[in-house]
Amino acid sequence: MSAARSVRDGRHRARIAALQLLYLRDVGGGGADEVDAAIERFWAENSASPERRRLAMSLFDGTSAALDRIDPLITEAAANWRLERMAVVDRLVLRMGTYELLEGSAPTAVVIDEAIELAKAFSGDDSAPFVNGVLDGVRRLLESAEPPRPPGTEEPLPR
């Protein structure tokens, strides 16, 4: 295996782990102590290199901490879809992909392609095109001059 493919594969596996951790937090509920215990159990049951674990935790922590920036972007890009009505895995893939687009450490095309692959692997048949469309919309919003406003802060339209 080439070095580039090995790095790519390691980053892909880190994204899978981060998605699983986000799912544990989202579906498991509970407080911070329960989430921390679930994360410790996850790592005890799933071996990973220190680099993969670091990247997975960075994606998990970054996504979790930036939801106030992430969710308005997804809501704006996913016209006619409310976050709470999206399939859980789709919502989590979109959140993590949006975080990566905001962070900018990976090329946009790679982030969107990885999100599509996660949707194909862990969600329904219609998920990949949905994730592709929404993240492309997020990409356009981020490239535009004015980012979307959080819900409820829109200025009234002129009459």
Show the residue positions of the predicted features.
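N-terminal interaction/assembly modules
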Residues: 1-159
